[in-house]
């Protein structure tokens, strides 16, 4: 694990979904880099973050470069996989069309996407989105390939013009506000289509994005195709839901156990109060209650710690309603744990 300065991140609103139910024992915790704290080994991640936001990184002898994807498309692909476990990668591509870069751009062709989704490795060509405005005699760029810096691109275009490597351009101007808008002004006699093709050829207005879908599987690096990435995500969510359900089941069983003790106390309220009052110490009162009513230590402790006024004022109807509701929850949670189809249904509903 890395030191904090390497792992700090500003979290957006969507990040809360990555941490959802983390306090319900849904994932394992491990010591942090200096063994002073515990940190999650992996996040519950209610949405498929690795595919949606992508990942880039290098290590000794390996690298990963997973492009970002459209959230809705990825979720549709996951749901389709849950509904049809035999779905092929080609069929998945009807849902997940390809990478969805935040800066836009146009992916040229689908062969690179298909290769990446099938083998885990591929290369795609991304072009800037540009329009030729003939009346104004200029090219307007509204989208750039992923990770291309607009200011550096404009500077480089001007350098190419100055060095005579690209002809037909008089100047560049940045008119961006909330939207990207880079203006490339042309000479009167320039052929805009030729200039644009030269810009694609000689500048970052056309870039190659090498896809390497490498991820850690059981702490081991592995190249994954699209179907494998989705399968591992579904399996992770199944594990998270099973662990969350077990946590909720334990909490409800503990609550039901307490309510059973309260029911006994209410049915024998006068004797219970007398036993508590006649006991010299709290441990003595607990022992007396456990011996007389076959209560557990947890039940006896809860009764003894309750103020006598509150104990005598407990309403049997409310306790009974709470108990019946809790038992229904327990039944439902046990049904989930006994049926994988119900678990997968919850995976789908959570998405």
Language model features by range: what are they?
Residues 36-52, 57-60, 65:
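Long insertion/accessory domains within large nucleic-acid-processing enzymes
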Residues 2-9, 13-17, 22-25, 55-56, ...:
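C-terminal interaction appendages of subunits in large macromolecular complexes
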Residues 18-46:
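P-loop NTPase nucleotide-binding/switch module
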């Amino acid at each position: 694990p890395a030191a904090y300065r390497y792992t700090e991140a500003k979290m957006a609103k969507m990040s809360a979904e990555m941490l959802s139910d983390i306090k319900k024992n849904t994932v394992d915790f491990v010591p942090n880099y200096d063994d002073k704290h515990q940190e999650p080994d992996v996040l519950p991640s209610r949405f498929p973050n690795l595919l949606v936001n992508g990942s880039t990184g290098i290590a000794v002898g390996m690298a990963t470069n997973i492009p970002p994807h459209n959230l809705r498309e990825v979720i549709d692909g996951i749901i389709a996989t849950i509904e049809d476990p035999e779905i092929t990668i080609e069929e998945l591509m009807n849902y997940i069309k390809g990478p969805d870069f935040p800066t836009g751009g146009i992916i040229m062709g689908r062969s690179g996407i298909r290769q990446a989704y099938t083998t885990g490795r591929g290369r795609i060509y991304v072009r800037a989105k540009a329009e030729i405005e003939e009346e104004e005699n200029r090219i307007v760029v509204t989208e750039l390939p992923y990770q291309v810096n607009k200011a550096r691109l404009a500077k480089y275009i001007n350098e190419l013009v100055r060095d005579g490597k690209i002809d037909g351009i008089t100047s560049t101007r940045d008119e961006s506000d909330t939207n990207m808008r880079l203006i490339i002004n042309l000479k009167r006699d320039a052929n805009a289509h030729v200039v644009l093709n030269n810009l694609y050829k000689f500048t970052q207005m056309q870039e190659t994005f090498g896809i390497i879908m490498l991820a850690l599987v059981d702490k081991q690096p592995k190249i994954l195709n699209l179907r494998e990435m989705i399968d591992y995500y579904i399996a992770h969510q199944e594990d998270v839901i099973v662990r969350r359900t077990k946590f909720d089941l334990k909490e409800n069983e503990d609550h039901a156990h307490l309510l059973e003790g309260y029911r006994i106390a209410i049915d024998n309220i006068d004797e219970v109060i007398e036993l508590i009052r006649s006991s010299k110490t709290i441990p003595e009162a607990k022992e007396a209650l456990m011996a007389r009513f076959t209560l557990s230590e947890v039940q006896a402790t809860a009764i003894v710690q309750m103020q006598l006024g509150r104990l005598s004022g407990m309403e049997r109807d409310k306790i009974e309603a709470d108990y019946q509701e809790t038992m229904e929850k327990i039944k439902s949670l046990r049904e989930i744990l006994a049926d994988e189809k119900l678990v997968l249904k919850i995976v789908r509903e959570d998405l």
